[in-house]
Swiss-Prot record:
NCBIfam families: rpsL_bact (TIGR00981)
Keyword RNA-binding: yes
Family: Belongs to the universal ribosomal protein uS12 family.
Protein name: Small ribosomal subunit protein uS12cz/uS12cy
Function: With S4 and S5 plays an important role in translational accuracy. Located at the interface of the 30S and 50S subunits.
Cellular component GO terms held in the UniProt record: chloroplast; small ribosomal subunit
Keywords tagged on the record: Chloroplast, Plastid, Ribonucleoprotein, Ribosomal protein, RNA-binding, rRNA-binding
TM ranges: none
Subcellular location: Plastid, Chloroplast
CDD domains: Ribosomal_S12
UniProt-listed InterPro entries: NA-bd_OB-fold, Ribosomal_uS12, Ribosomal_uS12_bac
Organism: Angiopteris evecta
UniProt lineage: Eukaryota, Viridiplantae, Streptophyta, Embryophyta, Tracheophyta
GO biological process: translation
């Protein structure tokens, strides 16, 4: 415990809360260019080939972002929009690519939960 004299000398510092998506620099989304598009395997009880991309953001960061949905058209030099949001079973993946914007097309034949995948309402 601090003495009153110590508290007069220098006050208590508030605890700074760290952001979960530092590469976005406080913005809701950031634009970036894919440098590598590949698949990776998830952590222990799960098994799959998850689609991810290495993205160089306009903020200067190089991050790993998850590509949601079934099938995608992304390749090297594709321009994408990145939002926050981690993938629990992929260590180090703290960002999602926004489908239906810039070079990332929406998910084909998706009928339900379309908003997250950039799909217009079917006629």
């Amino acid at each position: 415990m601090s003495t009153i004299q110590q508290l007069i000398r220098n006050t208590r510092q508030p605890i700074e809360d760290r952001t979960k998506s530092p590469a976005l620099r406080g913005c809701p989304q950031r634009r970036g260019v894919c440098t590598r598009v590949y698949t990776t395997t998830p952590k222990k009880p799960n098994s799959a080939l998850r689609k991810v991309a290495r993205v160089r953001l306009t903020s200067g960061f190089e991050i790993t972002a998850y590509i949601p949905g079934i099938g995608h058209n992304l390749q090297e030099h594709s321009v994408v929009l990145v939002r926050g949001g981690r993938v629990k079973d992929l260590p180090g993946v703290r960002y999602h690519i926004v489908r239906g914007t810039l070079d990332a097309v929406g998910v084909k034949d998706r009928k339900q939960g379309r908003s997250q995948y950039g799909v217009k309402k079917p006629k």
